[in-house]
């Protein structure tokens, strides 16, 4: 019975490369001359540092641009609130989302069941497994999910015949 998994996971190697490129650009840009602006990564948590709110926005724009160039969807980023860290300096914690959340998984299962396509969807941890009798049915489910779920980037892997 053919099946596939619906997952939502960023390529952390590409995220790391985008951070390194961002830090390199920030260190060479004239408008950041003499500032302490940088991006640090610890596992799935990024911390943006800057001298003020405006420069923090600039750091964020550089990071988003570099992520887009490396084909990392920026919808994976979950921005925390801006914190003051002494003087005028500010920081912002950004979390890289992983996995299909419970609400999104339920929404995907409901969409699949409401579509009247002859497939079954089941939640398995942080992924949703979709299985059906025909490969064409699974491909139509993939097309339907790409069209209907736009708030979170979805990947389809583990396609088995």
From Swiss-Prot:
GO (cellular component) term, any one: cytosol
Superkingdom, taxonomy of origin: Bacteria
InterPro entries linked to this entry: DUF520 (IPR007551), UPF0234_N (IPR035570), YajQ-like_sf (IPR036183)
Alphabetic keyword roster: Nucleotide-binding
SUPFAM superfamilies: YajQ-like
Entry's Gene Ontology molecular function annotations: nucleotide binding
Pfam families: DUF520
Protein family (similarity comment): Belongs to the YajQ family.
Function: Nucleotide-binding protein.
Protein name (Swiss-Prot/TrEMBL): Nucleotide-binding protein Bmul_0741/BMULJ_02519
Organism: Burkholderia multivorans (strain ATCC 17616 / 249)
